[in-house]
């Protein structure tokens, strides 16, 4: 599932839970989608951090 559809479905289930409640199946789906979303975000952060290089700075005299 692409990120936009994933977020739309998560938001839909959240709004439905506040308005009328969720079935057991929808609660399970909501948990699964939230886990999938956080796993994607964690993976993106990991990739970004792996690409970071420390740049040495010259010693400065004050």
Curated annotation (Swiss-Prot):
InterPro entries: DUF896. GO terms for cellular component: cytoplasm. Gene3D superfamilies: Helix hairpin bin (1.10.287.540). It is found in: Cytoplasm. It holds the Pfam family DUF896. Keywords: Cytoplasm. It comes from the Bacteria. Its main location: cytoplasm. Coiled coil: none annotated. Belongs to the UPF0291 family. HAMAP family: UPF0291. This is UPF0291 protein CBO2609/CLC_2481. It comes from Clostridium botulinum (strain Hall / ATCC 3502 / NCTC 13319 / Type A).
